[in-house]
């Protein structure tokens, strides 16, 4: 394809809305705009317009030049997707034509992170470069079908790429990136805090958190202060979540724990500064329920950028890098995670030695979104 990613009109298709919490698709949109492209971030569609008309608005996002947010509501029933998919896609093609017209003309690149097959590549007219970028595990045929028609596929795990071998498009591993807000902060010399501060960031309304193991660790470590960033109410989340009684009970237990602080969602730049205060980080997902199946997580790069030790459930992408992450070996349970946490915290000076902190920071800096775009550009 021999494409450069400068001076292009790019449509980013995201299954998560723009908001306080940022994931890969949000960071790629920002970095592409900084690189001199006109970038349009397509939010998931809102509820159907009962007046029978498409509602489309395009507003500037102030975080980068020439970065635009597309808010839209379809004029046909969304439930058609589940009962009459060919008709849904036919109507969606018409809707997308209106979106492209509202943008002001054809786009040069369609960059899709969508696993819901809302907008098959064949619905777009012209000859844009079609990039498919799944960052979560494809759990059903709909997610696999979402890659059909792509010119090239990128993913953050080799396991995900293997599932798209059914298509002729070449697939390439590109690790999660780290945003400029994190990589630009120079870590200072570390001194252990009293009490030790352990950081956790993410969406705490997700159903794949291993709440039992996490609460056990918190209870068994009363001398450690656990600081949580991210949504703990579904209403505050722009990246999904669940509001079932089990999650509500989990959040209440966190709120009532004397060694827990819930900060809620904050902007990336502020989060970067807060994470640098930490002595260590904890990741605790149930791999069997996890949307990434314990293969990779976006937050890992952000944690590594601080240089501090990470204690985690098993993550296959880093299984051969104990210098980067201290993880358990088991894939079917986290029963040994509390013991691992205790062992690492007990020897935190060793795990946060200068050489290890420098290695973690160096790894993160080699995976900035700017560098990931350079790698992607070389493959186009």
Model feature map: region roles:
Residues 332-335, 349-380:
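A charged, aromatic-enriched C-terminal amphipathic alpha-helix characteristic of glycosyltransferases
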Residues 190-209, 214-221, 226-229, 365:
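Conserved donor-binding/catalytic core segment of Leloir-type glycosyltransferases
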Residues 36, 279, 307-308:
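A short alpha->beta transition loop at the rim of the catalytic pocket in nucleotide-sugar-dependent
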Residues 19-23, 269-274, 283-304, 311-322:
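Nucleotide-sugar-dependent
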Residues 141-144, 178-194:
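Acidic anion/phosphate-binding donor-loop and adjacent secondary structure
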Residues 159, 176-177:
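Carbohydrate-associated surface elements
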Residues 230, 239-272:
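Nucleotide-activated donor-binding/catalytic signature segment of Leloir-type glycosyltransferases, i.e.
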């Amino acid at each position: 394809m021999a494409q450069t990613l400068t001076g292009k009109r790019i449509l980013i298709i995201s299954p998560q809305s723009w908001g306080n919490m940022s994931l890969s698709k949000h960071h790629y949109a920002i970095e592409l705009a900084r690189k001199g492209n006109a970038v349009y971030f397509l939010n998931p569609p809102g509820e159907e317009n009962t007046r029978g008309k498409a509602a489309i608005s395009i507003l500037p996002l102030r975080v980068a030049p020439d970065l635009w947010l597309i808010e839209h509501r379809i004029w046909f029933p969304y439930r058609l997707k589940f009962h009459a998919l060919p008709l849904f896609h036919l109507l969606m093609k018409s809707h997308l034509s209106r979106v492209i017209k509202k943008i002001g003309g054809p786009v040069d690149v369609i960059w899709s992170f969508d696993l819901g097959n809302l907008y098959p590549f064949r619905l777009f007219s012209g000859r844009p470069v079609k990039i498919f970028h799944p960052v979560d595990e494809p759990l059903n045929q709909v997610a696999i079908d979402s890659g059909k028609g792509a010119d090239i596929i990128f993913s953050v795990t080799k396991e995900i790429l293997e599932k798209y071998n059914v298509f002729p498009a070449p697939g390439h591993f590109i690790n999660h990136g780290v945003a400029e807000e994190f990589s630009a902060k120079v870590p200072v010399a570390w001194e252990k805090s009293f009490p030790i501060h352990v950081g956790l960031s993410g969406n705490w309304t997700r159903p794949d958190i291993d709440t039992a193991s996490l609460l056990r660790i918190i209870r068994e470590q009363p001398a450690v202060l656990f600081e949580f960033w991210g949504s703990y109410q579904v209403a505050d989340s722009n990246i999904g979540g669940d509001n079932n009684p089990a999650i509500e009970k989990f959040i209440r237990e966190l709120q009532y724990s004397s060694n827990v602080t819930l900060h809620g969602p904050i902007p990336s730049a502020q989060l970067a500064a807060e994470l640098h205060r930490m002595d260590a980080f904890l990741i605790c997902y149930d791999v069997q329920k996890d949307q990434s199946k314990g293969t990779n997580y976006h937050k890992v790069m952000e944690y590594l950028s601080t240089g501090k030790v990470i204690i985690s459930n098993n993550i296959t992408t880093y299984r051969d890098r104990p210098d980067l992450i201290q993880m358990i070996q088991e894939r079917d349970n986290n029963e040994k995670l509390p013991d691992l946490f205790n062992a690492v915290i007990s020897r935190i000076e060793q795990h946060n030695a200068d050489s290890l902190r420098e290695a973690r920071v160096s790894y993160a800096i080699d995976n900035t979104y700017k560098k990931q775009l350079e790698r992607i550009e070389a493959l186009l």
